[in-house]
Each structure stands twice: as C-alpha cells, then as structure tokens.
A protein has these predicted regions:
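Catalytic cores of histone-lysine modification enzymes
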Residues: 6-108, 158-163
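Glycine-rich phosphate/ribose-binding loops and adjacent secondary-structure elements
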Residues: 3
Length: 164
C-alpha cells in the first residue's frame, strides 16, 4: 500500500482535500466552551469504540527543547504528530479534523491509533460512550504537568471548569 509521504515540514500535498473516512462523521463549529474558539462536533451518532476523528500531522521526534504546541500529540516514544502554525485554521488545513477537539477531564473520546490508507500511522479519537449528533467532541489531553501550558495547569488546579 502506498501512502502520501508526510515530510517533517509538510503536512499534506492536498491540505484542503477532506478525508473520506472522517468528514461524514464530524464537523468544525464554534465551541461550547467559552474560551476555546473552534470545536469538533458529531455529524452522526457514535457508540462506544467507534472511530470519531483522525489526526494527521507533520512527523517529528519528541523533544523537550521544541517550542510548545497545543497541537502536538505524542504517537509513541519516537514520534510526535504536530499541526504546523500555518495549518491550524480550517481554511489552511482540513484534511483531518481531530486537532479541533477540545480538552475535557470527562471526555467523550480517547486517543487511539490506526494505519490510515492515505497517511499511514495516525492518531485517532475513539468514542468512550454514546455520542449524539451535534454533541461537541472532547478528549483528555493528558499533558504532563511538568511541561503543560499554564491554561492546562490552571484547569487541573480547579477541575470545576475547562470541561471538568
């Protein structure tokens, strides 16, 4: 099977071409979380274990010296996936959409992985409970507090807001 080669600095040759596995499942809209900006929403009903969304990104080696990115997800000990600064808006990149899912301490999805037919190994969001059409998709970012951004540390400290 041939995959589109994803270089370290190039997320996709076709960054505005929707992924056929994902775009019938979710859409991006204004988040219901006041300070979050955009969010990811269900376009169909999901049951526990269903594939909800996909996250493709540039491939890079994990490093504590790199600039912090809220869009970087650890795939394994040797690989991170990141959405570059110039690809974070949906008018710049919308091939996959999981990077638009907001954080919650009581999420309706969890992280997963799959071998995608177009991109190879990618991160996924899998339903942890039933999700209804129109419901916002959330995931626990699970940041290590030693490297987490201030907003996340604040949420941990007060776990009554920020998606509890």
């Amino acid at each position: 099977m041939r995959y589109l080669l994803i270089a370290e600095y190039r997320i996709s040759r076709t960054p505005l071409e929707p992924d056929s596995l994902e775009h019938q499942r979710v859409e991006v809209r204004l988040s219901t979380t006041e300070t979050a900006g955009e969010g990811l929403f269900a376009r169909t009903d999901f049951t526990t274990g269903d594939l909800v969304s996909i996250l493709n990104g540039t491939r890079c080696s994990p490093s504590l010296q790199d600039e912090w990115s809220d869009y970087k997800v650890n795939f394994n000990t040797g690989l991170d996936l990141d959405i570059p600064h110039d690809m974070r808006r949906t008018d710049q990149y919308c091939t996959t959409l999981a990077h638009k899912a907001n954080h919650s301490f009581r999420p309706n999805t969890r992280w997963g992985r799959m071998d995608h037919p177009r991109f190879g190994l990618v991160v996924t969001l899998l339903a942890v409970r039933e999700i209804s059409v129109g419901e916002e998709i959330t995931v626990n970012y699970n940041y290590s507090l030693s490297v987490a951004p201030a907003w996340y540390r604040d949420c941990v400290a007060r776990q009554t807001q920020c998606g509890e």
